[in-house]
Amino acid sequence: MTRVIGLLSFWDESPTWLAATLASMARVCDHAVVLDGRYALYPDQRLQSGSHEHYAVIDAARASGMGITLHTAPHTYTDEMSKRTKLFQLGLCEAETHTDWFFILDGDEVLVECPPKQQVVDALDAYREDGVGVVSATLWEKADPHQSELRTETNMKLATDWRYECSTPRFWLSHANMRVVGYHYNYVGEDELGTTVELWGHDSACVNRAKWASECGSVIIENRNRLRGIQRDKDRQQYYADRDACEMETVKPLEEYDA
């Protein structure tokens, strides 16, 4: 029987948000694999999130009747690619390759709308039989209009819509050797013949690209990234600035990464 396995990567997140993320995952997932850890360039000295965050993850999963695997270790991750690759490695320990699906959320996201679990699984089964390897969901991102003085002033003067909506890939058929190469949204894996397949990325010339489907019912994810506190937002922006200054992420043809 097909299983949907949730994958969650986080660092120093609100326990309330984490509990909401895990509880919402249980609406479509049988098991969740959670990875805690800081990027090396992130402006903080701690290596692991607080134990209260770990308890929130475990308790929310257990209360929701969902299996849970939590991995936390006292070291940093070089970059986003290495951490996400580790998450895929952990997920593949739980998944039946080329049969089960991964559903990915971040610690600042919550699944707010979706069909009943069996309906989602049936849709994913049908997609897999049709050769589909990636299925999208709808993402809502809403900013807090009063997070800063500038936003408050803008909100008072202009009729600004603070919600952004887009389609984003979130369900991934589990492939052997799933990993992230080059840049943080370049996912690759191996099909049943051992051929490297691009699951998500920029290489439009790649001949081995996974087949995508635009939706899986009305699955809607709310992203709360812009609702964080001012200091956390500053730390995030500092990390991205340092990451880009170091040129840690590169875009090039897929075959060059594996050369």
Report residues per predicted region.
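Catalytic-site signature of metal-activated, phosphate-bearing donor transferases
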Residues: 78-88, 109-259
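Cell-envelope/extracellular polymer assembly enzymes that use nucleotide-activated donors
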Residues: 3-5
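Short, high-confidence coil segments that cap the C-terminus of an alpha-helix
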Residues: 29, 97-99, 129-132
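Short hydrophobic beta-strand elements that form part
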Residues: 7-9
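Short, well-formed alpha-helical segments that are part of the catalytic scaffolds
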Residues: 13-28, 34-36, 45
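Short beta-strand-to-loop acidic/aromatic patch adjacent to the donor-nucleotide binding site
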Residues: 96-112
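Active-site-proximal specificity loops/subdomain of glycosyltransferases
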Residues: 37-100
